């Protein structure tokens, strides 16, 4: 199998680099300065066991690869707000022997949130969800770090519509040769909804900074209470905190230090967009559909989007000001 990593940022480059180290055939898909750096200097990937430079083929789109191969695996690691453009571009790519990628090739959605699987299922016949537990950092072109140990990350995977198949097992085997644990599960979306609850704090970190603070923890708990209530009202199951702890404890330990997460990194790089619509916004959507007020998540989504649109630096708001906005929104309910 050849792995085409669509979005070679923090997550994509780490998975792609680790797969390449283990002998898998990999193509990294990137754009702009990052693509130029990867082509010129290679991928500089730092993990717990050191720094290596990987010379991996780089493409900016499907046209550069010509006909895709029947054994290609598409790993979608762009942020959800960029998923439609990527799915449309790659879905129409022709595959040797006839048909398109959307008709014949598997696409794995390795992203935060739960919307990309739904977007992919509108276009692709073979869609897999991946619940990504892989703290990684991408702040400058061509350079990525993922410092967890003893494993680089844990990647639960399965069919997005439920169930698992032999292909998932083969992909998992490649990942497990590459520094990951990759449990194949029948209910991958249940794991992704649980991860969604954890990601509700991304907007807090992005707007007020990554440093721990009791008021930030309190705001996250309020957002998670709304999230759990919305999931219950919608009849959506999610893995418990105990299940997640059992799956991860002692396997993906981060070294000491404060690091910004994916949303913080988006603001730091000045990308102009942020994934809050598909994290806090997912809870807002479910709340409106099922009669559950979500003022804290509404506030966090709105604040994060203002930061992204206006190019504000991460951490430019005090947690006191953000909490006051959430309190005002809650008082209006």
Question: What residue ranges belong to the model's regions?
Answer:
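Short phosphate-binding/catalytic loops that engage adenosine nucleotides
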Residues: 24, 43, 125, 180, ...
């Amino acid at each position: 199998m050849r792995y085409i990593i669509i979005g070679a940022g923090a997550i994509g480059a780490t998975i792609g680099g680790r797969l390449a180290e283990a002998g898998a055939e990999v193509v990294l898909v990137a754009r702009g300065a990052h693509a130029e750096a990867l082509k010129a200097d290679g991928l500089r990937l730092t993990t717990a066991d050191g720094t290596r430079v990987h010379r991996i083929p780089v493409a900016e789109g499907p046209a550069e690869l010509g006909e895709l191969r029947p054994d290609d695996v598409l790993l979608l690691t762009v942020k959800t707000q960029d998923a439609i453009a990527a799915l449309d571009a790659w879905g129409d790519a022709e595959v040797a022997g006839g048909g398109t990628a959307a008709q014949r090739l598997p696409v794995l959605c390795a992203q935060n949130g739960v919307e990309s699987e739904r977007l992919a299922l509108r276009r692709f016949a073979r869609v897999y969800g991946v619940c990504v537990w892989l703290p990684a950092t991408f702040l400058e072109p061509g350079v990525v770090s993922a410092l967890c140990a003893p494993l680089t990350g844990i990647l639960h995977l399965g069919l997005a519509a439920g169930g698992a198949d032999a292909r998932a097992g083969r992909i998992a085997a490649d990942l497990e040769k590459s520094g990951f644990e990759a449990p194949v599960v029948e209910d991958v979306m249940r794991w992704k909804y649980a991860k969604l609850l954890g990601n509700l704090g991304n907007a807090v970190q992005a707007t007020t900074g990554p440093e721990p603070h009791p008021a930030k923890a309190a705001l996250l708990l309020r957002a998670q209470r709304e999230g759990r209530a919305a999931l219950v009202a919608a009849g959506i199951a999610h893995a418990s905190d105990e299940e997640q702890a059992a799956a991860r404890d002692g396997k993906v330990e981060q070294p000491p230090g404060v690091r910004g997460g994916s949303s913080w990194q988006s603001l730091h790089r000045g990308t102009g967009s942020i994934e809050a619509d598909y994290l806090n916004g997912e809870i807002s959507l479910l709340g409106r559909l099922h009669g559950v007020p979500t003022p804290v998540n509404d506030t966090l989504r709105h604040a994060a989007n203002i930061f992204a649109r206006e190019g504000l630096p991460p951490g430019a708001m005090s947690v006191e000001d953000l909490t006051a906005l959430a309190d005002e929104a809650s008082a209006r309910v």
